[in-house]
Amino acid sequence: MAVNGIIGIKLGMTQVFVEDGTLVGCTVLQAGPCVVVQRRTKENDGYEAAQLGLVEFVKPQRVNKAMTGHFKKANVAPMKVMQEVRIEESKDETKVGDRVLVENFKTGELVDVSGVSKGKGFQGGVKRWHYRGGDASHGSMHHRAPGGIGGSSFPSRVWKNQHFPGHMGNVRVTAKNLKVVKVDTDENLLLVRGSVPGPSGTYIFIRKAKKAK
């Protein structure tokens, strides 16, 4: 199967001893199981892809009529979270109803994990953009203020995307090239080295690294 991605849930973090005895921080991810709900083909849609759905219990009354018909056509149970993933091989035999499991990933390979980061609300420039800040003493009255932005006679305006205080977090972020430390096929668990966007319990999408280093 050429599907190189899977939907999951971030469970939390732990520590694992690797082969050389080093203690590394890892994120525990529940990866799948997923089911192919829809198949996109180059003949009908112009590209090759598969729409995956995460297998978990969903109350039928929480699903609208349009999505109920969509799931009924695929002959699968209603699902809360779905994600479309591209398929590279045009002659791939992936079809509706196929299961996508964590066994598609191997220990030691690199993956990209996408999720929604933790929301921080309105934050200042020091926390949001890592400004150095002003002097902490000697009469300074600007400890955490942004300071000048260099807009005098030129350009006489504020540059677009100028770093200012504002809303921080709660955006979709991708952590790239995370190394798979362990794969547990019995419990559908994937341990990756390092941190992953979002709080525990958030939905994430795992795919094999696009730009592996």
Residues covered by each model-derived region:
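Extended basic (Lys/Arg/His-rich) segments that typically form rRNA-contacting surfaces
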Residues: 1-213
